[in-house]
Amino acid sequence: MMVAEMVADRVLARVTAWLLAVSDTTDVASDRYPPLVEGPAQPRPAAFAGVGGYFDALSWRPQDTEGQPAAVSWFRPTAHIVDTDPASPLQQLAAVVDCANGVGAILDPNRFLFMNTDTVVHLHRLPTGTDFALRARASVGPDGLGVTTAEIFDTTGFVGTSAQTLLVRRR
């Protein structure tokens, strides 16, 4: 198990990961979902328009999912995680997965905060490439808590899932 912490006066962030030994299971590999095909990009949701910072570090391409139970967006990181080193597909995917609560948002961000307090990622294979899609949906309970779940894709197919606990507050 690997654990890394970002510390200032206190722990600001913690990453815990199991480093698993891999073996060849090519002959029995299967995907739960068919690959997602990127369509024409739709406008970024109005509530997120003009928001800079983190959003400037990604090419965000929402998809038309009218009438479907989950929202879909494709992403490509546009900024380096470390200026001098190119990011691996796994590192780029980690930056994208943080967006799931925005992709699956069911609340107006002008009226509500819905901060993800954690992110859990389960991969069934390593991602490839630089473009990743999230198919995300959120649920909000009656007590200020919620959850966003997402299926994660690269351009070749399903990669894994994520879950985020949401802290929901009125603005």
Q: What do the predicted segments below correspond to?
A:
Residues 1-171:
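Terminal targeting signals and extreme-terminal segments of soluble enzymes
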